[in-house]
Amino acid sequence: MKTVKQHAANDLLEFTIKAHGGRENFNKFETVSARLICDGVLWSMVGHPGSVDDIYVTSHTNKQFTSHRPFLNKDWHTAFTAQHVAIKNSKEDVIEELSNPRDSFAGYTTETPWSQIQLAYFTGYAMWTYFNAPFNFGDAGYKIEELEPWIENGEVFQRLQVTFPEEIATHSPVQTFYIDKDGLIKRHDYNVDIAGGATAAHYLSDYIDVQGVKIATKRNVYIRQEDNTPLFPEPLLVSIDLREISRK
């Protein structure tokens, strides 16, 4: 039997999913693609400045798969899944690949540089997470809980804590989503486990309608402090501007 709290969390999730376009619209297509314009200090911190300044991405919605192109070389692209990641050329020849990629980050901190295949893993799971939220939260294996509301800059946000299934590659098992009065996700908190558990407060804005689904076109990520506030305005860890968005 579901508790009152579980019913409240489910109602909040349904409200959020509906505000983003609804499951029916989301399930009409199998992929989301966009041009990404990225910046922020993270890329230099991990040893790859400029690597994703202007890049194209496609993520699947019915399985965990993402590809970025061109990736580090105009002829290369990535093929990411939770358990395997590869860099390939235009002929689909494998340039580099790695199974169980998450294990390769053991002992890493925010100051540890990444290999190019590790960069492919991070960018792959990150964009998949962003493109699929909140629609996947009702899938088997996900657990949701409503937290106490949060007030920021005079605005009240409802909060949904999501525990991801073990088989899904993402920032951390437990993440928190801040939902405004219209049902849109405006902030997303997580720890970056592959970078020593670095804390993040990730802000979403400038939503547009893409074939019936609401997608945030601007994302800015800051350090999340112990009091749950962002360290603002610097350092800006990551910024992502999405353009040329399409669903197929």
What are these regions (language model features)?
Residues P70-S115, R224, N228-K248:
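Catalytic loop of the DD-peptidase/beta-lactamase superfamily, centered on the K-T-G motif
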Residues V4-D11, S90-I168:
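Flexible, processing/modification-adjacent segments and terminal tails
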Residues L13-I17:
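Short, Gly/Pro- and small/polar-rich lid/capping loops
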Residues R23, N73, F135-E146, F157, ...:
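Intrinsically disordered terminal and processing segments
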Residues V41-V52, K63-F71, W128-K143, F164-T170, ...:
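Short, solvent-exposed secondary-structure boundary motifs
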Residues G154-K248:
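Gly/Pro-enriched, hydrophobic low-complexity segments
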Residues F26-N27, W43-M45, Y130, Y190, ...:
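Tryptophan-centered motif/residue detector
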Residues K2-K5, K18-L98, E146:
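N-terminal mature ectodomain segment of secretory-pathway/periplasmic proteins
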